[in-house]
């Protein structure tokens, strides 16, 4: 199998603290919070380190986006919950953090004829009038790759870094087998 370098661009993680949150209290107590109930049902809290944004909902669910590593994603959620705990001391200390999506990019170091790829490769969608990339859906690992004529690839839907890397490498190998790269 070919070794392709991937770069994590974004990680989306979520957690549920198992307790309802009074959003107005949080928005008044924390700096860096945007809250407009008419526009969006949750708070948007921007953290500087790690540079992320957390969406906080009244149900106690949090969604963190913008992290470039799984560790930073988890750290951002923990920091956000710790800050919320200064407002509401009954927020539990134990909660599960789940990685929902990893977006990664890679460069196949070769241009691609996307029309030929669409004809030869199964599980693809290519409508250049709608979107310049070819959508390639893999089942193992369960990821979606966006392939561009430049040879750039975006992988989405991965739950682990290794799944993102494996998805890109399997696509590279399949393209090589078909003499498309």
Curated annotation (Swiss-Prot):
A GO molecular function held by the record: DNA-binding transcription factor activity
> Do the record's keywords include Coiled coil?
no
Q: Which domain of life is it from?
A: Archaea
Instruction: Please give the SUPFAM superfamilies that the UniProt record associates with this protein.
Output: TATA-box binding protein-like
Task: Name the Pfam families for this protein.
Answer: TBP
One BP annotation, GO? DNA-templated transcription initiation
State the PROSITE patterns in the record. Answer: TFIID (PS00351)
Under the heading InterPro entries, the entry gives: TBP, TBP_archaea, TBP_CS, TBP_dom_sf
Record's keyword terms, sorted:
DNA-binding, Repeat, Transcription, Transcription regulation
The residue spans of each sequence repeat are 8-84, 99-175
Role of this protein? General factor that plays a role in the activation of archaeal genes transcribed by RNA polymerase. Binds specifically to the TATA box promoter element which lies close to the position of transcription initiation.
Xref: HAMAP family: TATA_bind_prot_arch
Q: Which family does it belong to?
A: Belongs to the TBP family.
Q: What is this protein called?
A: TATA-box-binding protein
Traced from the root, the source organism's taxonomic lineage reads:
Archaea, Methanobacteriati, Methanobacteriota, Methanomada group, Methanobacteria
């Amino acid at each position: 199998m070919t070794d392709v370098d991937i770069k994590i661009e974004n990680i989306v993680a979520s957690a549920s603290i198992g307790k309802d949150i009074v959003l107005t209290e949080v928005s008044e107590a924390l700096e860096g919070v945007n809250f407009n109930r008419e526009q969006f049902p949750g708070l948007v809290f921007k953290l500087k380190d790690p540079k992320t944004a957390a969406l906080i909902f009244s149900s106690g669910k949090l969604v963190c986006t913008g992290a470039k590593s799984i560790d930073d994603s988890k750290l951002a959620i923990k920091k956000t919950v710790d800050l919320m705990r200064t407002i509401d001391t009954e927020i539990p200390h134990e909660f599960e953090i789940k990685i929902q999506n990893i977006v990664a990019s890679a460069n196949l170091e070769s241009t691609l004829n996307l029309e030929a790829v669409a004809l030869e490769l199964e599980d693809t969608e290519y409508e250049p009038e709608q979107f310049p990339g070819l959508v390639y859906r893999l089942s193992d690992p369960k990821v979606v790759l966006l392939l561009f004529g430049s040879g750039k690839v975006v992988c989405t839907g991965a739950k682990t870094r290794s799944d993102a890397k494996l998805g890109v490498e399997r696509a590279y190998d399949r393209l090589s087998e078909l003499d498309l790269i």
